[in-house]
Amino acid sequence: MGLSDGEWQLVLNVWGKVEADVGGHGQEVLIRLFTGHPETLEKFDKFKHLKTADEMKASEDLKKHGTTVLTALGGILKKKGQHEAELKPLAQSHATKHKIPIKYLEFISDAIVHVLHSKHPAEFGADAQAAMKKALELFRNDIAAKYKELGFQG
């Protein structure tokens, strides 16, 4: 299930574009997640009051959280699958404190792919999309394994 060196290179090339505007990308990803899957908003007390995409766009807190999410994910992606140290505390907090179901990680993965494709169509063609989907699936599978170790059935 691992990625080839070439696939990792495709993932990291487009991730460089994300890092140039991590806050903007993160905000768009969360807006896409929350508008496409409103049930996910219930896990975020801080954002529950945001009902429209315009309200979400105006929220500095949402942008900050988007930055946090994509910065953490970028750190994991740069490990090219060797992300045990980064993944463990993330799985712990998402399983025990936030109680985020794996399904929601699938939803945000889809949102990430959509946002990257809409913002960077030239750099995020079919091969790069397939590589990113594979990298995000690897991340989710590893989180799911940690959830199981923690006794969380997310």
Curated annotation (Swiss-Prot):
<keyword id="KW-0561">Oxygen transport</keyword>
<keyword id="KW-0813">Transport</keyword>
<dbReference type="Pfam" id="PF00042">
    <property type="entry name" value="Globin"/>
</dbReference>
<dbReference type="InterPro" id="IPR002335">
    <property type="entry name" value="Myoglobin"/>
</dbReference>
<keyword id="KW-0479">Metal-binding</keyword>
<dbReference type="GO" id="GO:0098809">
    <property type="term" value="F:nitrite reductase activity"/>
</dbReference>
<dbReference type="GO" id="GO:0005344">
    <property type="term" value="F:oxygen carrier activity"/>
</dbReference>
<comment type="subunit">
    <text>Monomeric.</text>
</comment>
<comment type="function">
    <text>Monomeric heme protein which primary function is to store oxygen and facilitate its diffusion within muscle tissues. Reversibly binds oxygen through a pentacoordinated heme iron and enables its timely and efficient release as needed during periods of heightened demand. Depending on the oxidative conditions of tissues and cells, and in addition to its ability to bind oxygen, it also has a nitrite reductase activity whereby it regulates the production of bioactive nitric oxide.</text>
</comment>
<feature type="binding site">
    <location>
        <position position="65"/>
    </location>
    <ligand>
        <name>O2</name>
    </ligand>
</feature>
<dbReference type="GO" id="GO:0019825">
    <property type="term" value="F:oxygen binding"/>
</dbReference>
<keyword id="KW-0560">Oxidoreductase</keyword>
<feature type="binding site" description="proximal binding residue">
    <location>
        <position position="94"/>
    </location>
    <ligand>
        <name>heme b</name>
    </ligand>
</feature>
<dbReference type="GO" id="GO:0004601">
    <property type="term" value="F:peroxidase activity"/>
</dbReference>
<protein>
    <recommendedName>
        <fullName>Myoglobin</fullName>
        <ecNumber>1.7.-.-</ecNumber>
        <ecNumber>1.11.1.-</ecNumber>
    </recommendedName>
</protein>
<feature type="domain" description="Globin">
    <location>
        <begin position="2"/>
        <end position="148"/>
    </location>
</feature>
<dbReference type="GO" id="GO:0019430">
    <property type="term" value="P:removal of superoxide radicals"/>
</dbReference>
<feature type="modified residue" description="Phosphothreonine">
    <location>
        <position position="68"/>
    </location>
</feature>
<dbReference type="GO" id="GO:0070062">
    <property type="term" value="C:extracellular exosome"/>
</dbReference>
<dbReference type="GO" id="GO:0020037">
    <property type="term" value="F:heme binding"/>
</dbReference>
<feature type="modified residue" description="Phosphoserine">
    <location>
        <position position="4"/>
    </location>
</feature>
<dbReference type="InterPro" id="IPR009050">
    <property type="entry name" value="Globin-like_sf"/>
</dbReference>
<keyword id="KW-0349">Heme</keyword>
<comment type="similarity">
    <text>Belongs to the globin family.</text>
</comment>
<feature type="binding site">
    <location>
        <position position="65"/>
    </location>
    <ligand>
        <name>nitrite</name>
    </ligand>
</feature>
<keyword id="KW-0963">Cytoplasm</keyword>
<dbReference type="GO" id="GO:0046872">
    <property type="term" value="F:metal ion binding"/>
</dbReference>
<dbReference type="InterPro" id="IPR000971">
    <property type="entry name" value="Globin"/>
</dbReference>
<keyword id="KW-0597">Phosphoprotein</keyword>
<keyword id="KW-0514">Muscle protein</keyword>
<keyword id="KW-0408">Iron</keyword>
<dbReference type="GO" id="GO:0016528">
    <property type="term" value="C:sarcoplasm"/>
</dbReference>
